[in-house]
Amino acid sequence: MPRHSRILATGLALLSLIFIRNASAQGRGGPPATLTAGVRGGRDFENHAWSLGGQVGLRLRDRFEIRPSGDYFFGDETPFRWQLNADGAVTFGPSRSIYAGGGAAFVKVRPLDDVKTGYNLFFGLSFAPAQSRSRPFAEFRWTWVNDTSPFRLVVGFSYRLR
């Protein structure tokens, strides 16, 4: 099994165990689903590129959120032009200020003028209580695609719509 596949399988297994444990502790009740939207900007340190994008979050359970997002990359050295993500995230701790997740990545690769698929792993910190309407965050993100895995630091905020 290739190294990247082992990392992905291990990460997904850990997230599944955490989600199952949290879901069983919550019982059948729980808060209603919440919807968030936000903007974010980041820096790809390997390819020396800046990014600007947005994300939407749909919290299905108390600590699990589906989080699609998209980013556009600026710079001539980066092979990436844009990236769409289909991610899920799990929050930790009593204040839900730490989160981790992963998912699929769809990346427009410039030299090939083609869209490649890969996967993401990330973890981050939210700087406001879970019940806050606006939540600033910082995220550490890796995307494996086209035999590369650049590290990105992403900062932004999410605003609760409902």
Range-by-range predicted roles:
Residues 55-139:
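Gram-negative (and chloroplast) outer-membrane scaffold detector with strong preference
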Residues 149-162:
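Outer-membrane beta-barrel "beta-signal"
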